[in-house]
Design a protein with these regions (language model features):
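Signature of N-terminal electron-transfer/Fe-S-associated modules in redox systems
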Residues: 2-242
């Protein structure tokens, strides 16, 4: 039996500075975003419930959050800039610095680490000549380390704009980012084809996504369900197995 040793230490520094950038949008951008925002807020009985999708909307405009985006959300939802900023800086999916066309996240949590996640992160940092939290000079790839991609059954996992690339190795991860930088992005293991970070942010805002295709879980995810079905297992309303 082979032994696995884990060394826990400080992760590379990642972007987390104050939100910077333009303080206001040009009129044409404001008009366009306002039309989208009206479509989004109409889904909610209380407009402020639309804050998260509106933050994705302004992120789709700038590639990150800016004072202009914060102000836009605050004005549309009758909130203060401070209230919007408090929410925006709580969630890691809202970026505080300009993000490349492809946000490449490497999981380094326990299972992915055991299966090689740390080696993948180290390989990509060397291959791209950047640290986690930085962007390549061509603006194509931003690298980050992630504590969990919620895909432990396919560890080690790399995500690109939150689409899954399962069972990765240092070699396959290098090939992946090379494809992204050359303009030939590979298809994810499952889910929708890749689009740019800004296009993904627009999708997360709840606007039409022309890329969506079957999103069923993979075989490994459903292994427990299949076994339960084969054994005739079920659950009663009180939660006790039968």
């Amino acid at each position: 039996m082979s032994e696995v040793f884990l060394e826990l230490g400080q992760r590379p520094d990642e972007a987390g500075p104050p939100i910077n950038g333009p303080a206001a949008y040009p009129d044409d951008v404001t008009d366009r975003l306002t039309a989208d925002a009206q479509h989004i807020t109409a889904r909610y009985p209380d407009a402020r419930s639309a804050l998260l999708p509106l933050l994705h909307l302004v992120q789709s405009e700038d590639g990150c959050l800016t004072p202009a985006g914060i102000r836009f959300c605050a004005e549309r939802l009758d909130l203060t800039d401070a209230e919007v900023t408090a929410v925006a800086t709580f969630y890691s999916m809202y970026r505080r610095t300009p993000t490349g066309d492809y946000l490449v996240g490497v999981c380094t949590n326990t299972l992915c680490a055991i299966m090689g996640g740390d080696a993948i992160l180290d390989a990509l940092q060397e291959h791209l000549d950047i640290h986690a939290g930085q962007t390549t000079a061509d603006g194509r790839v931003t690298l980050e380390h992630i504590e969990c991609n919620a895909a432990c059954d396919y560890a080690p996992v790399v995500m690109v704009n939150w689409e899954f690339f399962d069972n990765q190795t240092p070699s396959s991860a290098r090939d992946l980012v090379d494809g992204l930088r050359s303009g030939n992005p590979p298809d994810p293991t499952r889910g929708a084809p890749l689009c740019t970070f800004r296009e993904t942010a627009r999708t997360l805002a709840g606007l039409t996504d022309p890329h969506v295709r079957g999103g069923a879980p993979g075989a490994a995810t459903l292994a427990g369900l299949r076994q339960a079905q084969e054994l005739g297992m079920s659950a009663d309303p009180d939660g006790a197995s039968a």
